[in-house]
């Protein structure tokens, strides 16, 4: 419990390679986290065994939740997990299995409690291009991606009126013909190695790697939901029901537009996201994940 709220962490899993780093981080916060839900989506039997063994270590605290179609890399599976995330007096935090560092999770919870007017609240996330862009970290933005934010915002502003007419199963950026990913920041693992290395070498400078105060996201921008918190009461209030749509743009574009309720970044809290799938092959050839594992 924290601030009178039950705290539930949910992780779509999973890959043992990543979970070997994430599970000890979550385990270290067991004293105030009320429940850890493992959203089981393993495709490798050994990964599944690893998750089940972890759950066995923590009876009554870890809950295994199975998807509708075990076990595929399928959006239908992802979105089915959200069905039971709307209890009153509960703060939910979705933490992807490739989050490899968390600082001040309590701050993320406190900011979510303090800002009931915000639907979703994010920490600053390393390797989440909108965080680097909105933080104004030009030195981290490759020349190929310098104009990405301006193009996205201009195109979205011009096309957003169409959102309410789009079918619920349609990927919004594709439907609106938006350039969804910055080419280098999302797709080039060489850039990601440099980014993680820089963070690992300078992470003690927390002002560099977090927002100094709560920051409202007042544009329709598709922040990657590698880690995000919400109030169950808000989901009930706004009747949030995700059934067929890709979750990322549903949470960050469609709902803010339809409801007029914007998201935000918590102050002084940080997470590191290991990789988007195009980055993984190159990252796995380095010692980056091993360096994160040694931080605990």
Residue ranges and their predicted role:
Residues 15-30, 46-50:
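Short, well-formed alpha-helical segments that are part of the catalytic scaffolds
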Residues 3-7, 29-38, 62:
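Short loop->beta transition adjacent to catalytic acidic/histidine clusters or analogous donor-positioning motifs
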Residues 7-16:
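A conserved hydrophobic helix/loop-capping motif in glycosyltransferases and polysaccharide synthases
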Residues 23, 89, 100-113, 161, ...:
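Short alpha-helix within the catalytic core of nucleotide-sugar-dependent glycosyltransferases
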